[in-house]
Amino acid sequence: MLSTMQDIPLSLTRILDYGSAVHGQTQVVTWHSARDGAEREETNFATISARAAAFAHALHDTLGVTGDERVGTFMWNCAEHLEVLFGTACKGAVFTPLNKQLMNDQIRHIINHAEIQVIVADPRLAEQLSKVLAGADSVRAVVFTGATKPPVLMPRGVEVYSYEELLDGRSTVYEWPTLDERTAAALCYSTGTTGAPKGVLYSHRALYLEGMQLRSSDSLCVTHGETFLCCIPIYHVLSWGVPFAAWMTGAPLVLPDADVSPATLAKVIADTSPRVAHGVPTIWIQLFVHYLKHPPERMTLTEIFAGGSPVPPL
């Protein structure tokens, strides 16, 4: 006998739509201390969701992504990274973040193994990406975040676009397909393992359930109204799935971009008042030493989750 309860696919599309409708004004702050221009860039869930839809249109209409092609990213934690994540996965393509800290030949291996066709990259990484793409034959387009394209040549046959120009004028409404919840949403590759990096395909269902689990008090307790500082990069297990839990609950996010040095993090924490954060132990040990020399006037951070390596005794 089957139940009479509702049965709907657990997909990132439902998370995206719910977060933008119910928690649309929840803030996302990107801290651009290592980039020219304003340090603090503010947006919200509704705007990110709308721009994710515009990016999905660009993928289909201009970049030729019509199925489950892999779309890579080569960037740090920022609002645009979330737009690309949601826009890619909800469209039915496979989001594939690349770890810039790997050796170039390892990154090239990932691109070739995943057969990535489009890469969205930070222009500060243009020179490294140009070297990586030599011998990465599957890539046919690179999109650089920002309004302009960096003066760096990409290999022959690779079209180069500006992210803002690509999104300009696009509809911010997308008729997301109804995906089987077992459909792959993201493809992440291992680091620090023997041999070549190894890929793991995450289903929409798995990421949906992860987001629900992260809301639990027995887990990271991602909670409505409590700001979460995301120092785990999106290219490391999708920042542990925290963005999905945040979209479910309405938890504001702080994204530190490229600079997670102690002085910068101390400034970010003082300015944005996060209650919870996650990151590798090295970051927090360095921040602890910084605070010993420069005690903060006030401290809102009450919980830190560390992973990736054992936490040494302080």
Question: What kind of feature is each model-predicted range?
Answer:
Residues W76, A121-K131, A147-K149, I232, ...:
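Adenylate-forming
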Residues G24-Q27, P155-Y161, D168-Y189, A196, ...:
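Conserved pre-ATP/AMP-binding loop-to-beta segment of ANL
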Residues Y208-T227, Y235-R275, H290-L292:
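Conserved AMP-binding/adenylation subdomain of ANL enzymes
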Residues E41-T47, A185-M212:
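Conserved AMP-binding A3 loop
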Residues D7-W31, A50:
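A short N-terminal helical cap/helix-turn-helix that marks the beginning
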Residues E69-R70, W76-T96, K100-N104, N112-V118, ...:
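A short helix-loop-beta submotif of the ANL/AMP-binding
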